């Protein structure tokens, strides 16, 4: 079972060094409130540590991932993702099976950009951020690693 990291960009590109913008581009996080899912590997964690003042991340649970796919993921044509689209294009029975295969590491969301519009675009969080985006999550801020609390933030941003 692969651990999936949900990564959300929370700060813009202005006054950011070029290497930060380049790393965010590699993670496909071009704009504020874009999100992507990646497996937890040492390479991804190294990139996240480099850009931590601009993103927040944590382990996403299957329920939140399913909600994210249903509500915010778009097909390449701009329509909402449905069971019939997943069955037609990916040859997977339904969205539940797709989520299961994402967690088993059989398919990767970041490699399916020919079928879906990636990255996934989110709204700003309902009720606003609880802390400052200029401080780390551990010090009553918002950026950096937040573990399972990423699920709560993603649900507020859908």
From Swiss-Prot:
Name the UniProt record assigns to this protein: Large ribosomal subunit protein uL30
InterPro entries cross-referenced by the UniProt entry: Ribo_uL30_ferredoxin-like_sf, Ribosomal_uL30, Ribosomal_uL30_arc, Ribosomal_uL30_euk_arc, Ribosomal_uL30_ferredoxin-like
Stored NCBIfam families: PRK06049.1, uL30_arch
HAMAP family: Ribosomal_uL30_A (MF_01371_A)
Gene name of this polypeptide: rpl30
Subunit: Part of the 50S ribosomal subunit.
Entry GO terms, CC: cytosolic large ribosomal subunit
Protein family membership: Belongs to the universal ribosomal protein uL30 family.
Protein's GO biological process: maturation of LSU-rRNA from tricistronic rRNA transcript (SSU-rRNA, 5.8S rRNA, LSU-rRNA); translation
UniProt KW Ribosomal protein keyword: yes
Organism classification: Archaea, Thermoproteota, Thermoprotei, Sulfolobales, Sulfolobaceae
Annotated keywords: Ribonucleoprotein, Ribosomal protein
Native source organism of the sequence: Saccharolobus islandicus (strain Y.G.57.14 / Yellowstone #1) (Sulfolobus islandicus)
UniProt superkingdom: Archaea
GO MF term (any one): RNA binding
